[in-house]
Amino acid sequence: MKETLIFDLSRKGRQGHRIASLDIEPQPAINLIPEKFLRTEPADLPEVPESEVVRHFIRLSNLNHHVDKDMYPLGSCTMKYNPKINDQTADIAGFTSIHPLQPAETAQGTLQLMYELGEMLREIAGMAAITLQPAAGAHGELTGILMIRKYHDSRASKRTKLLVVDSAHGTNPASAALVGYDILSVKSNAEGRTDIEDLKAKLDENVAALMLTNPNTIGLFEKDIKEIEQLVHDNGSLLYMDGANMNALMGITRPGDMGFDIVHYNLHKTFSAPHGGGGPGSGPVGVCDKLKPYLPVPVIEKHDDGNTSRYTLTTDRPLSIGRMMNFYGNFSVMVRAYTYIRMLGAEGIRRVSENAIINANYLLSKLIDRYDLPYPKPVMHEFCLSGDRQKKQHNVRTLDIAKRLLDLGFHAPTIYFPLIVSEALMIEPTETETRETLDRFAEAMLQIADETENSPETVQNAPQFTPVKRLDEAQASRKLNICCPGC
């Protein structure tokens, strides 16, 4: 049933609460507010009792799909279940009542948590130093690329180009362009991995760095990474790893050991904080030893004084790229990530990645006979199918398949990305899904494959059972209208 707008529930004179009479003379609010701040006409606010407000938003929440409701297989997004203990620790009063401008000596517990989180992340990725400031993955990319530019500038090397592998995470070219680099794309080979010969052809004295994602966005590990690392470093360039797919690597291998100079993490993805709907996110950046001087300020430092430790915020870094935020990053996400890592421990962190890989390969084995796999298996934590067969034989597009999944109770995978896969369906089940849930999702995908062959119009006209049927997404993007009636 379609849910009405809160404004349509409004009836003149209805109130949520009535306040009991007071013993003191009431003052009209307009007498307490300077005239320059007063509205010239009343706000058009809905008049709805509290019970109806609560029911309205509960009904709306039930229309949403989220990871607490069912599987959310959005490729390259790591929509894992987030343990509720993470939220409980993030809500501790000592963390929620602090202010970023208060003296460091009065926030020692907060600084200790941030320092220890940085040390754990540094160890997981095998890097020399870290900043927690960036507010999201793409913000981490921007931070890393600014450090790349500062590194080359400090060596009087005015490099103008940045290479991005075509299977890398989608925000990489945009982040590099923001810093002013010319972007060159490095092709993938027939295996879906970086084409070494194309890389060699594009490496020259003007290349500042190579950006790639490992595993890449079709779920394949770059098995030639040591050769890639050697080529890049022999050219005087830096090697950047997008950590979007770090969920496949934890405790198994480390970017620093592969030779990466910079890596950014996504705490909201790999380290289990709720994300989607605009955040908050957190995109810490780890660097090798030679890039430590360029890290954003302030830097948290630990000082051991006998039996106690104290933590300070240091800004005396003359080669630093400066601040990336007004303050120190999205702290509530850091608390959740810290809780997650401490709860799992080293063995648990490795088990997360092992189970993510097992789940992806298990699900792929259930679907591979009915959907095309453009590149060879095995995969890591995610895989990318193609809907080419369905489109060519039955005129059913990947978009149709994704919409039909909504009818069957699942969120759709990432579609039409990466661009190197035609009619792409990128699926990441994560480690937190049970075998039974994976089987249910596989059954839904196989049902859609059957419908594509026997009644393609069922898939082409999906969704039929959602509160809103198929939207004209192109028109919605071009002619955005977010105003309620009467606004």
From Swiss-Prot:
GO terms for cellular component: cytosol; glycine cleavage complex. The keyword NAD does not apply. One of its GO terms (molecular function) is glycine dehydrogenase (decarboxylating) activity. The keyword Oxidoreductase applies. Keywords: Oxidoreductase, Pyridoxal phosphate. Its EC number is 1.4.4.2. This is Probable glycine dehydrogenase (decarboxylating) subunit 2. It comes from Prosthecochloris aestuarii (strain DSM 271 / SK 413). The gene is gcvPB.
